Amino acid sequence: MIYALILAGGKGTRLYLLSRANQPKQFLKVINNKSFLVNTVERITPLIKKDNIYVITNQDYLSKIRGELSDVNSKNIFTEPENKETATCIGLSAIKLLKKDNDAVMVVLPSDHHIEGQKAYLDTLSEAIEIANRRRGIVTIGINPTRPETGYGYIEMGERIPSGAQAYKIARFTEKPNIEVAKDFLLKGTYLWNSGMFVFRADVILREIEKYLPKMYKSLMNIYQHIGEEDEEEVTREEYGLIDGISIDFGVMQRTRKAYVIKGDFKWDDIGSFNALSRYLNEYRNNKISNNVYIQDCENCSIFGGNEKLIIGFGVKDLVVVDAGDVILVMDKDKDQEIKHLLNDINETPEFGAFI
């Protein structure tokens, strides 16, 4: 059977201030007055029925997710004792689904992307499901790049495989290149953006975890033996303490020989940075601004105003300004991808850590 797994435990730190620890990005209402999480569930429902839609998150967000997704069975919401990156949360979800269904196929979706082109999106995932079953492959969805983007990973397309879609073996992955490399990838035309969406059988991904992450696999199998038992939560917590967290890209996808990519013919945006989010603000004389902003003689600025005060920009350029009420961020636009390092430093400063 086909199951959707929605990854909803991240904190969205690159959108700091708009996305906070207590209100991360997946709960933001940016596009249509619905949260990214709700849009993700509604988008996949025509392909996968609600009973087969699962969400994995951490304990801090459990009640918030139950409130957002009141029509999703609470038993379908998995929680992790701590964040150990995507390979771990996918592995944990895989053993839980495999326990109930030996033929489980997982459609893994981030909870915080914006997608337009519903039919093409569902058709692409349907083709990925077919390849995952027929070839026992690990399939990811690639997006045709429209600009030299340094905030995304890239996938080089290899040999095309017989399929109704544009499906290829993966030649290699490149994680977030610099601007010159990104420009070169765009010109070559053989590279796709890595969307972070995956399709695979639960048993296949677990075999690949066993092969490339044997220590993690051992912990997952120990948890598997206790699923449904009284001590499941305790064992999960203990085994998570032994796991070295790693992303599914670094841990499995860049190593496996079972990797395929399908080119998705739909509009996709990972609104994971202020530069990305500014594409959805109002255009004003080569600037992007929200409500409660007045600017004059400014160039290439993105200004996110709050509800209680007016932000005035005068004679500045290449800035991101964010008003979150208790914190105001002023940042050079070129630092967009470096904000995680800044937040780590602030978090280690006792008098400021509470603002993260």
Write out the residue ranges for each language-model feature.
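Short beta-strand segments
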Residues: 6-8, 56, 107-110, 140-144, ...
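Conserved N-terminal catalytic core of the sugar/cofactor nucleotidyltransferase
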Residues: 2-6, 14-21, 29-110, 116-126, ...
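Residue-level signal for inorganic ion chemistry
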Residues: 27, 37, 93, 112, ...
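Short histidine/acidic/glycine/proline-rich micro-motifs that form metal-
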Residues: 113-115, 145, 268
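A short acidic, often aromatic-flanked loop/helix-cap motif at beta-alpha or helix-coil junctions
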Residues: 83-88, 147-149, 179-181, 268-269
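Left-handed beta-helix
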Residues: 203-204, 209-356
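Conserved core of the sugar-phosphate nucleotidyltransferase
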Residues: 118-230, 234-237, 260, 308, ...
